[in-house]
Design a protein with these regions (language model features):
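A generic structural signal for ordered alpha-helices
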Residues: 9, 16-20, 54, 68-75
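Short microdomains enriched in Cys/His and/or Lys/Arg
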Residues: 59-81, 114-126
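A boundary/linker detector
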Residues: 1-30, 34-36, 43-47, 118-126
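Short cysteine-rich loop/turn motifs with clustered Cys
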Residues: 25-71, 94
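Short Cys/His-centered divalent metal-binding micro-motifs
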Residues: 90-116
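Generic domain-boundary/flexible-linker signal
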Residues: 50-53, 87, 105-108
Length: 126
């Protein structure tokens, strides 16, 4: 069993990112299928799908990097500011960048948001 570093998920199954096509109808994973698996802010790349159980016992498919750092779906215009859940308003973003952005706007987000630059370079290079 693998434990994700940020989310409290117990990952029980891993699939290659190429299997994402099988999930193109899945509400959240559709964002990664249509817009890619790279954080729009720091460039961190999702390379695998992990199926895990959260602390409430619910199972989810999520996108992870090689070292199981999660990518999330971000609202370009935050819901708190009237943004929708439509695909046009959603983008892939790593967990750290998404937390840093909060309910702010993309243009206000510092592109060097404390993400490990060496790790980012490693994922971009591979």
């Amino acid at each position: 069993m693998i434990r994700a570093k940020v989310f409290k998920y117990e990952i029980v199954k891993v699939k290659p990112i190429s299997d994402l096509i099988k999930f193109k109808g899945h509400r959240r994973l559709k964002v990664f299928y249509n817009k890619g698996c790279t954080c729009v802010t720091c460039g961190l790349v999702g390379t695998k799908l992990g199926y895990g159980k959260d602390k409430k016992g619910h199972f989810h498919w999520d996108v992870y990097t090689d070292d199981f750092y999660p990518l999330t779906v971000d609202h370009i215009i935050p819901k708190s500011k009237g943004g929708s859940d439509e695909l046009e308003n959603l983008q892939p973003m790593c967990y750290k960048c998404n937390v840093t952005k909060g309910n702010g706007d993309n243009h206000k987000l510092n592109l060097n948001v404390n993400c490990n630059k060496d790790r980012v370079k490693t994922f971009i290079a591979t």
